[in-house]
Amino acid sequence: MIQDLIILGNGPSRYECNYHCETWGVNGGYAFAKKLDKLFMTDGPDVMVEDISPECLEKLATYGCTLVLASRFSEVTPYYEGVGIKIEVYPIEAVLKKFNTKFFSNTICYMLANALLDTEITLDTPSGLPRVTSGYNRIFFYGIDMMTTTSYQQEKGGVEYWMGIAKGMGVEVINTKSSATGKTYNGRMYGWWGQDNEGEGVLYAPWEIIKVGKKEIPIEEEWAKSGEDWIKVPYGTGVK
């Protein structure tokens, strides 16, 4: 069966998500998501147990959400199963065998790899380009904004690497307009069609003007680099 998938991150554009198909969330996404089919968590087991309130656990159980954990977190499995949460161990060995790479810079990379693991393709097409025959043929990104002067600059390349693997398999990755993922600093192709240095060094989408669709986003904080230091900076438009 060919189907769509949403990978829901925790960035500002998460408010655009319409949950129109199977939805996978990451780490603290359980706190705001309207539905989740899977929740991938790679934080330490102490954080995973202490930070999830009974109310959130009840919500995940109501969704029928499966919690996907690394095998090294097996010690917390009884805790979640005891409150009715289904547990799935991340198939790391199968992923490493199929893709022959260890380039995973954050949880989103693991999520993309997991989706592509279950996707089959054919090259027997008129164009010779790959076509999906089963699994996910369209992956929608929401909340995977990865603004390039924040701590995400250390992770962004990994996500884009897996986006490239997806494209090479004929899988379409559909991102939000306000995301910096898969884009140059100014949204232009280098060296073509009037490309110049105008705006060089300017953040792709400045914090103070970020809006997602027609919705304002709450004021939150993100790590950003200032000189040699990392500082927390606010973003959002202040909706209550």
Question: What is each PLM-predicted segment?
Answer:
Residues 1-240:
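Metal-ion/cofactor- or nucleotide/acyl-coenzyme-handling active-site neighborhoods
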